[in-house]
Amino acid sequence: MEREIDLQEVSDGRLYTSTDMVKLGCNDCSGCSECCRVVEDTIILDPYDISQLCQALETDFQGLLAGGRIELSVVEGVILPHLKLKEGRGGCTFLDSAGRCRIHDYRPGFCRMFPMGRIYENGDFRYFLQVHECPYPNKTQIKLKKWLGIPELARYEQFVKDWHFFLKDAERKLSEAENEEIPKRINLFLLQQFFQKPYGDAFYEAFYERLSEAGAVL
């Protein structure tokens, strides 16, 4: 999810890359699951996240919806999936009674990154540390790449950039639509193209093939 922020108010004033050391270490969140309990409907999922969740739960996109794991919402005119919260008291549905994540190895990029955020500019992005988000005391230095724990991180970060700026283009075209039917058709196409069709084992190859097809359509 995008936010308008003042970096000086929410961060330590630095911008990071994945090779930098950042004060994030928290002993694997031992005794704490605060960020998973107070979360709101703001964990927007990208195609990689959906692919990972489908693998973890051995299901497909429709299964995630029917199983109450995700919901759809409109973000800047684009319909996108987000994690669904527990009914009533809220919190992540993947948090177990011991305060641990049931899908930790497959968790979404937002969860992996927290309490880091991303700032996009000039076709690229860098990370920033949200200093008021994580209450865990006495954090230690850790390399951001290790904190993220994502295989083939360079490919993943390129995907993140390409997906972000593709969505920006889609948002612009949706906002310029001359009638209500055009956004409906585009959103249905995007859901089918990037989320409903399984990715299999070769996620990046499949994603970029679909991205090329979508670029030609839009």
Summary of predicted features, one role per range:
Residues M1-L218:
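Short loop/turn segments that flank or connect secondary-structure elements
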